[in-house]
């Protein structure tokens, strides 16, 4: 069922970094086929478990799924869409005792306004999945376009490529492909 380790010290950010394509596909299936949230999250959790099977890692990917789905609507301000995504994900995870216990680790992302106001020096961007989702959301909340979001993520230091990938995925969903600087696209091989 999974290859990833499930211990508490196995909460790296690798599965979160790779989950974006799955989230986009599941969002499409929800729109086209009426796939239910519970089914989407089962799939997201199984995908995470390929490399990171601890519930905290799987929940991070689940929260990311909700962020992708809500940001793709682009019908409200970014902070409002993110808050809605977090509210929906917390409501889902509060239904299960195990995941409900894990929600304490996500306390800093519970309120987008409070998260946005945290000082940069208090944002960690290492390899721990909780740090990564916090940093990605913080970067998105504290910028107003794709480029600045990705640069802010990189400038946090530490695990810069992963934090930028996680934040950049969400920024790309919200701001769109045309928001990516052309000179960044030009250097992509075989694009």
Feature locations, PLM:
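Alpha-helix C-terminal capping segments
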Residues: 24, 142, 169-178
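Short amphipathic alpha-helical leader/targeting segments
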Residues: 34, 167, 182-186
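Amphipathic alpha-helical interface segments
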Residues: 1-143, 149-155
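Conserved glycine-rich phosphate/nucleotide-binding loop
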Residues: 173, 177-191
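Active-site proximal loops enriched in glycine and acidic residues that flank catalytic Cys/His/Asp
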Residues: 153-154, 164-167, 188
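Extended hydrophobic-aromatic, low-complexity segments
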Residues: 146-150, 162, 181-183
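Conserved phosphate/anionic-ligand binding catalytic regions in large, soluble enzymes, centered on
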Residues: 13-17, 160-173
């Amino acid at each position: 069922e999974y290859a990833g380790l499930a211990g508490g010290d196995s909460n790296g950010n690798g599965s979160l970094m790779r989950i974006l394509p799955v989230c986009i596909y599941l969002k499409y299936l929800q729109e086209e086929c009426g796939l239910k949230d519970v089914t989407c999250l089962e799939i997201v959790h199984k995908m995470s478990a390929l490399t990171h099977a601890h519930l905290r890692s799987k929940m991070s990917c689940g929260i990311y799924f909700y962020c992708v789905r809500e940001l793709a609507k682009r019908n409200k301000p970014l902070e409002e869409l993110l808050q809605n995504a977090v509210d929906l994900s917390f409501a889902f995870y509060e239904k299960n005792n195990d995941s409900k216990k894990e929600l304490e680790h996500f306390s800093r992302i519970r309120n987008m306004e409070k998260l946005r106001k945290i000082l940069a020096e208090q944002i960690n961007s290492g390899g721990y999945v909780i740090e990564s989702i916090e940093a990605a959301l913080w970067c998105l909340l504290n910028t107003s376009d794709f480029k600045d979001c990705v640069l802010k993520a990189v400038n946090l230091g530490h695990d810069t490529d992963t934090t930028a990938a996680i934040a950049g995925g969400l920024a790309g969903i919200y701001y769109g492909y045309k928001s990516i600087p052309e000179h960044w696209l030009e250097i992509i091989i075989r694009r």
